[in-house]
A protein has these predicted regions:
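Conserved glycine-rich acetyl-CoA-binding loop
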Residues: 71, 85, 90-108, 117, ...
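Conserved beta-strand-loop-alpha-helix junction that forms the acyl-donor binding cleft
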Residues: 123-134, 151-155
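A generic structural signal for beta-strand entry/edge sites
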Residues: 83-85, 121, 155
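Conserved GNAT acetyl-CoA-binding A-motif
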Residues: 114-126
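Hydrophobic secondary-structure block in the mid-to-C-terminal portion of proteins
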Residues: 136-142, 146-157
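Extreme N-terminal starter segment of soluble prokaryotic enzymes
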Residues: 1-3
Length: 162
Protein backbone atom coordinates (compact mmCIF):
# COMPACT_ATOMS: atom_id res chain seq x y z
CA UNK A 1 0.00 0.00 0.00
CA UNK A 2 1.29 3.45 -0.98
CA UNK A 3 1.56 6.04 1.79
CA UNK A 4 2.89 9.59 1.88
CA UNK A 5 4.08 10.93 5.21
CA UNK A 6 6.61 13.17 6.89
CA UNK A 7 10.12 11.76 6.90
CA UNK A 8 11.52 10.44 10.19
CA UNK A 9 15.03 11.55 11.23
CA UNK A 10 16.44 8.02 11.03
CA UNK A 11 15.23 7.73 7.41
CA UNK A 12 17.42 10.54 6.07
CA UNK A 13 20.27 8.21 4.99
CA UNK A 14 17.75 5.96 3.18
CA UNK A 15 16.16 8.95 1.44
CA UNK A 16 19.57 10.29 0.41
CA UNK A 17 20.53 6.91 -1.02
CA UNK A 18 17.29 6.82 -3.02
CA UNK A 19 17.95 10.29 -4.43
CA UNK A 20 21.53 9.40 -5.35
CA UNK A 21 20.37 6.12 -6.92
CA UNK A 22 17.78 7.81 -9.13
CA UNK A 23 20.10 10.71 -10.01
CA UNK A 24 22.80 8.17 -10.92
CA UNK A 25 20.42 6.76 -13.53
CA UNK A 26 19.02 10.10 -14.71
CA UNK A 27 22.45 11.64 -15.26
CA UNK A 28 23.92 8.43 -16.72
CA UNK A 29 26.78 8.45 -14.22
CA UNK A 30 29.40 5.89 -15.29
CA UNK A 31 30.96 5.57 -11.84
CA UNK A 32 29.90 2.90 -9.40
CA UNK A 33 26.92 4.11 -7.36
CA UNK A 34 28.90 4.06 -4.10
CA UNK A 35 31.71 6.10 -5.66
CA UNK A 36 29.23 8.59 -7.06
CA UNK A 37 27.46 8.89 -3.68
CA UNK A 38 30.74 9.51 -1.87
CA UNK A 39 31.70 12.18 -4.40
CA UNK A 40 28.42 14.07 -4.11
CA UNK A 41 28.35 13.74 -0.32
CA UNK A 42 31.84 15.27 -0.18
CA UNK A 43 30.49 18.23 -2.18
CA UNK A 44 27.52 18.63 0.16
CA UNK A 45 24.99 18.05 -2.61
CA UNK A 46 22.18 17.09 -0.21
CA UNK A 47 23.33 19.24 2.72
CA UNK A 48 19.79 20.56 3.20
CA UNK A 49 18.78 17.09 4.37
CA UNK A 50 21.37 17.00 7.16
CA UNK A 51 19.22 19.22 9.37
CA UNK A 52 15.63 18.73 8.23
CA UNK A 53 14.26 20.38 11.33
CA UNK A 54 16.00 23.69 10.71
CA UNK A 55 15.96 23.64 6.91
CA UNK A 56 12.38 22.52 6.42
CA UNK A 57 10.18 21.95 9.47
CA UNK A 58 11.07 25.06 11.50
CA UNK A 59 10.95 27.22 8.38
CA UNK A 60 7.37 26.66 7.11
CA UNK A 61 8.47 23.72 4.99
CA UNK A 62 7.95 19.98 4.83
CA UNK A 63 9.88 16.90 3.73
CA UNK A 64 7.78 13.92 2.73
CA UNK A 65 8.51 10.34 1.79
CA UNK A 66 6.38 7.99 -0.25
CA UNK A 67 6.43 4.39 0.93
CA UNK A 68 5.27 1.11 -0.51
CA UNK A 69 5.01 -1.66 2.07
CA UNK A 70 7.03 0.52 4.45
CA UNK A 71 9.92 0.92 1.96
CA UNK A 72 10.77 4.45 0.81
CA UNK A 73 10.20 4.75 -2.93
CA UNK A 74 10.03 8.53 -3.34
CA UNK A 75 10.66 11.91 -1.76
CA UNK A 76 9.35 15.45 -2.05
CA UNK A 77 9.86 18.65 -0.09
CA UNK A 78 8.96 22.30 0.16
CA UNK A 79 11.36 24.96 1.38
CA UNK A 80 10.34 28.53 2.21
CA UNK A 81 11.80 31.30 0.06
CA UNK A 82 9.68 34.07 1.57
CA UNK A 83 6.17 34.51 2.98
CA UNK A 84 4.58 34.18 -0.47
CA UNK A 85 6.95 31.86 -2.33
CA UNK A 86 8.02 28.31 -1.60
CA UNK A 87 10.49 26.14 -3.48
CA UNK A 88 9.84 22.58 -4.53
CA UNK A 89 12.81 20.41 -3.60
CA UNK A 90 13.95 16.79 -3.69
CA UNK A 91 11.14 15.31 -5.80
CA UNK A 92 12.50 11.89 -6.72
CA UNK A 93 10.79 8.57 -7.42
CA UNK A 94 12.38 5.19 -8.10
CA UNK A 95 12.19 4.40 -11.82
CA UNK A 96 10.17 1.24 -11.32
CA UNK A 97 7.31 3.36 -9.94
CA UNK A 98 7.21 5.90 -12.79
CA UNK A 99 4.08 6.07 -14.91
CA UNK A 100 1.71 5.02 -12.13
CA UNK A 101 0.46 8.47 -11.07
CA UNK A 102 2.58 8.45 -7.92
CA UNK A 103 4.42 11.65 -8.79
CA UNK A 104 1.05 13.37 -9.08
CA UNK A 105 0.02 12.02 -5.69
CA UNK A 106 3.18 13.40 -4.12
CA UNK A 107 2.65 16.75 -5.81
CA UNK A 108 -0.96 16.94 -4.59
CA UNK A 109 0.26 16.46 -1.01
CA UNK A 110 2.86 19.18 -1.51
CA UNK A 111 0.33 21.54 -3.12
CA UNK A 112 -2.03 20.98 -0.19
CA UNK A 113 0.74 21.83 2.26
CA UNK A 114 1.65 24.96 0.28
CA UNK A 115 -1.97 26.12 0.29
CA UNK A 116 -2.25 25.51 4.04
CA UNK A 117 0.80 27.74 4.55
CA UNK A 118 -0.75 30.41 2.30
CA UNK A 119 2.05 30.36 -0.24
CA UNK A 120 1.04 32.14 -3.45
CA UNK A 121 3.69 30.75 -5.80
CA UNK A 122 5.87 27.66 -6.00
CA UNK A 123 9.27 27.63 -7.70
CA UNK A 124 11.68 24.90 -8.67
CA UNK A 125 14.87 24.27 -10.55
CA UNK A 126 15.50 21.30 -12.78
CA UNK A 127 17.97 20.22 -15.44
CA UNK A 128 16.01 20.30 -18.69
CA UNK A 129 18.70 18.38 -20.61
CA UNK A 130 18.96 15.41 -18.24
CA UNK A 131 15.65 15.56 -16.41
CA UNK A 132 13.41 15.86 -19.47
CA UNK A 133 10.73 13.68 -17.95
CA UNK A 134 10.62 15.85 -14.81
CA UNK A 135 10.62 19.05 -16.89
CA UNK A 136 7.65 17.82 -18.93
CA UNK A 137 5.87 16.66 -15.76
CA UNK A 138 6.22 20.10 -14.18
CA UNK A 139 4.95 21.80 -17.35
CA UNK A 140 1.87 19.54 -17.32
CA UNK A 141 1.26 20.57 -13.70
CA UNK A 142 1.21 24.24 -14.72
CA UNK A 143 4.76 25.37 -14.07
CA UNK A 144 6.25 27.84 -16.55
CA UNK A 145 9.82 29.01 -17.07
CA UNK A 146 11.14 32.08 -15.26
CA UNK A 147 14.61 33.68 -15.09
CA UNK A 148 17.10 31.60 -13.09
CA UNK A 149 17.31 32.54 -9.43
CA UNK A 150 20.44 30.57 -8.59
CA UNK A 151 23.89 30.34 -10.11
CA UNK A 152 23.51 26.78 -11.42
CA UNK A 153 23.81 27.30 -15.16
CA UNK A 154 22.65 23.76 -15.96
CA UNK A 155 19.23 24.31 -14.42
CA UNK A 156 16.12 26.00 -15.67
CA UNK A 157 13.90 27.79 -13.14
CA UNK A 158 10.15 27.31 -13.17
CA UNK A 159 7.24 28.71 -11.21
CA UNK A 160 3.51 28.27 -10.84
CA UNK A 161 0.75 30.29 -9.24
CA UNK A 162 -0.91 28.26 -6.50
Amino acid sequence: MIKIRRIKPDEVPIAKQLIYRVAHQVFHDTRALEESMAYYESRGELHDMDDLQQTYFDNDGIFLVMTYDDQIIGTGAIHKIDDEICELKRVWLLFEYHGKGLGYRMMQELFTFAHEKDYQRMRLETDRDHQTRAFDFYKRLGFYEIPRYSDNEDDVAMEMIL
